[in-house]
Regions:
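P-loop NTP-binding core
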Residues: 1-276
Length: 276
């Protein structure tokens, strides 16, 4: 199973939630191999796994960015010369074991670390995705880059977690397209509500402002390539208050978010998992 943490807004506690979820899952499932893929160029999740502020997490992360980058940026760099066909690579060359840097992390967790260079690669990746080649769906070939990476691993991991950047850039689309399930954290504010509404539109093409956008949407392109969209697994109300329960000041916003979700569940039940 492949889970992606994402929302179209920063500051929702997504990376903290990802870290806590992944580490707890690995502790409770010692017999399973867990892979973390950090698709956020800020690489905050990777830094946490590699030691955080007090454990030289930043220095450990920077040590991965040598000539042979052991990161998602290193993998993307090796895909740029071969964007539309899967090259002969060893996926394990890009993966590290964070336990070697941070003994507090379970040794059944591996990570494809985040990399700031991904931001620099974005224009090249987007250009390749929009290249016109006879007989080749260049967009889906590029969107499949992480899916290709996972296939190369050939079932080595029972569960995979992806941490995504809040933007809906090409690398975020690459991440989301590879997931089975989405976990969307929200906070008790109107911007989180708008971000959730944006997520429904960006990923699933729901409530587009105009039909003009529909044929070019992420959902339409994936469906055209006979690819399944991930389903929404959880919408996590994160950081509501430092006290027990929900802060009454934010109750109206939370009720609005609940109503938005209920409306979409009623009109598009197929985009939700409804299961553990």
């Amino acid at each position: 199973m492949i889970y992606a943490f994402w929302n179209n807004k920063g500051g929702t506690g997504k990376t903290s939630l990802s870290f806590q979820t992944i580490t707890r899952y690995a502790e409770k499932h010692e017999g399973e191999n867990v892979l973390v893929i950090d698709l956020c160029p800020q690489a905050n999740l990777s830094e946490l796994f590699l030691g955080g502020l007090v454990g030289m997490g930043s220095a450990n992360l920077n040590s991965l960015y040598g000539e042979n980058r052991k990161s998602v940026g290193g993998y993307f760099q090796d895909r740029l010369p071969s964007p539309f066909t899967v090259p002969l690579i060893d996926a394990n060359n890009y993966i590290i074991k964070p336990n070697k840097y941070n003994s507090a992390i379970s040794d059944n967790i591996d990570i494809l670390a985040g990399d700031p260079i991904v931001e620099l690669q974005t224009n090249s990746i987007a250009t390749l995705a929009n290249t016109q080649l006879p007989g080749t769906d260049t967009w889906i070939s590029v969107i499949n880059w992480i899916t290709d990476f996972i296939k190369i691993l050939d079932g080595k991991y029972e569960v995979i977690f992806l941490d995504c950047n809040p933007s809906f850039s090409i690398y975020t689309q690459i991440a989301i397209s590879s997931a089975d399930r989405l976990i969307l954290p929200v906070m008790a504010d109107d911007s989180s509500r708008r971000a959730l509404q944006n997520a429904f539109s960006l990923v699933y093409g729901i409530k587009m402002p105009s039909s003009i956008y529909q044929q070019y949407s992420f959902a339409a392109k994936l469906k055209e390539a006979n690819r399944k969209l991930p389903v929404i697994h959880c919408i996590v109300k994160n950081r509501l208050t430092q006290y027990m329960g929900t802060s009454s000041a934010y109750q109206s916003v939370l009720l609005s978010i609940d109503q938005d979700v209920r409306n979409v569940m009623k009109s598009n039940p197929d985009i939700f998992s409804f299961s553990n």
